[in-house]
């Protein structure tokens, strides 16, 4: 490119200047006068070996090619800004737009130039032109299209330019477009801003819709899960009611019922666990007919529950789980299969009966041989004395019935009727228990000694158990508010109320049992006492050798030793009682007769002419004790006979006994006499006096002085003890009397009598006014 004569050399200034410009011609001539002007180039000569021969096209016809391509793309062109209104200007415009008629078509590859090449500014918005800014000219045309209703004239011009039919040579239209270009740009910005706001709002609405759809799907899934759980619970309940479920767990572990959902892969933690809180951990549908909650660990037929036997033989018949007095082929106790008693058969003595719970290894070996029910009964009754109570295994439809089953409905299912004599383990497969959360009649905890080890429970001597059962039956009253003790109805659970207040000792003579058996309020614990029962068929009472009386002391009972005492009677009341340990001198239940429970946890006093309301049960009970003169807290100070309802009142009263009763003439008080004497001997007040025997206060504390001295002595007492004739004591009394008279402590002030008279007058006036 060093050689300027090179035909490939192109001056860059030609792209920015018009060839007709004088400055361009002068500059071009000055650079290299030997190079001819562009018009002098013989570009269309066929014999010339130039660019046409190499590329097969005219080099200077490239502008026409680009213009034609831009027209095919429907991109409008802008004329040169230097064009005017003259005819020469119109030619320049035509040359700039390069418009051809039908006879003069533009050919892309023709070797002959259709128009002379004039290197000028491109009219497209892509390559730019003079005065061009960063905003595309296309956008201004589009905004003018949007504002067609406001300014229709530019739209007509744009349509003409878009259709390429005619070109207006009047520059006023372009000036008009440039004038409206500012307004169009403002409107375009407003529209773009509104479009952006609408787009953002639309995106937010889409997000909200997606959240709502997700929440709806979650709700549908949750409802489906709940529906499945309800269906599973209904299926399990139907299986339990029909008795179709069988125990498939080991003894001592809760039963896990396999539902269809669990079989599909549900975890074991989600299994439905059937629990109970009965005495032996059994669970059955329907529940057994119990007269009242059991208060003993002893089994119904007089022998402890055989936990080891159930664990060793879990697959045996239900009657093998406990001592059954019936034939081995009978699985349940029916209404007609009741016990009959006769003296010719097995004897049962309460004193001679002993039984072990197979806790040692020797008893385990013996258990393997005792498989049949008859052998167990025979071996058990062999140990009884001949003078005991006899039980016959005969089963007869006319056998006598216990008074506990007289009110049983025969039309009821057999399992209801068997609930009194038959343990729970004989009514349904065993399901070991868990603690139940809901406290109802069937889930009341059994009364057990918490201090006794678990492995030692149910292993007491039967004589001791029977004695405890006698005590519980004689002490435990009927449930308040129940007219009879028929089988529990399917209604709301009854409330079991116990009052823990001091009670009287029960009668120690337990030989008279006839009123106990004939009483209508009996529980199933009294089944443990084997007594003659009236025979309905012969209408006579069979005589038996009298059983030795069982004496019972509630204060010495090992079973009830750790529990709070139970009352010997409970007076019916309308409000439930809470467990309180407040001492009282009144009979049990007396205070609660005057308590009325109101809504909003309020309590009203029912004492005549009182009707006070309290917020706490403790406060109303203390208030009623004041009405009834019940003051259990008495002062133990010598000579004091005061008593109080509450303990803190007694404590406050005792402080008054320890008041500072030793007074110095200066007005200072002391609790002890020796402290007063030491104070006076120091001569630091007006009442100071030098005594005959100086008293030196020890620097040690009172506790150390008591530990050092074997006897509780004081200097004053020692001085008085050394006085044989009493002269020192007389002198001390005279000095004290003189000092008190000197300070006016013996003679009352003259205004005291007048003050008492005035107070008496005011009291009399108040009583007259009332």
From Swiss-Prot:
Entry-linked PROSITE patterns: ZINC_FINGER_C2H2_1, ZINC_FINGER_C2H2_2
Single GO BP term: positive regulation of septum digestion after cytokinesis
Subcellular location: Nucleus
Positions where Phosphothreonine occurs in the chain: 259, 486, 501
Region (Disordered): 77-97, 286-323, 699-770
Location of Phosphoserine modifications: 80, 122, 247, 249, 253, 385, 392, 483, 564, 709, 714
UniProt xrefs under InterPro entries: GLI_C2H2-zinc-finger (IPR050329), Znf_C2H2_sf (IPR036236), Znf_C2H2_type (IPR013087)
Biased composition (Polar residues): 294-304, 754-770
Domain of life of the native organism: Eukaryota
GO molecular function, one term: zinc ion binding
Zinc finger (C2H2-type) in chain: 603-627, 633-657, 662-685
Pfam families: zf-C2H2
Function, as annotated: Plays a role in regulating basal-level expression of CUP1. Activates EGT2 transcription in the absence of SWI5.
Record's protein name: Metallothionein expression activator
Organism encoding this protein: Saccharomyces cerevisiae (strain ATCC 204508 / S288c) (Baker's yeast)
